Amino acid sequence: MPKRIMKGVVVSAKQDKTAIVRVERTFTHPMLKKIVRKTNKYHAHDENNVAVEGQTIAIRECAPKSKLKRWEVVAEEGTEA
């Protein structure tokens, strides 16, 4: 089974080897027929501490690394000022 990959913005990179990433998705509400934006925050494993707050990164699903971490940082996209 392929691993899911998502893109999101780093909200916090204060913890050692951990980045909290906000991922936003849009969908059409089934009853209201309006476009709805939903955000989720994921704890991602950042082995080399490369993530910076405000940066857009890609995260990939992985085996559990701790109580909350089930994702790992794959690639950096760039920074948003």
Swiss-Prot record:
Q: Which HAMAP family match?
A: Ribosomal_uS17_B
Q: Quaternary arrangement and interactors, per the entry?
A: Part of the 30S ribosomal subunit.
Could you identify this protein by its name?
Small ribosomal subunit protein uS17
Q: Which Gene3D superfamilies match?
A: Nucleic acid-binding proteins
Which CDD domains does this entry report, sorted A to Z?
Ribosomal_uS17
User: Which GO MF terms does the UniProt record name?
Assistant: rRNA binding; structural constituent of ribosome
Coiled-coil zones: none
Record function comment: One of the primary rRNA binding proteins, it binds specifically to the 5'-end of 16S ribosomal RNA.
Q: Which UniProt keywords apply?
A: Ribonucleoprotein, Ribosomal protein, RNA-binding, rRNA-binding
**Family statement drawn from the similarity comment of this UniProt entry:** Belongs to the universal ribosomal protein uS17 family.
Gene Ontology cellular component? cytosolic small ribosomal subunit
Q: Does the keyword Ribonucleoprotein apply?
A: yes
InterPro entries assigned: NA-bd_OB-fold, Ribosomal_uS17, Ribosomal_uS17_bact/chlr
Transmembrane stretches, start-end? none
Q: Name one GO biological process term.
A: translation
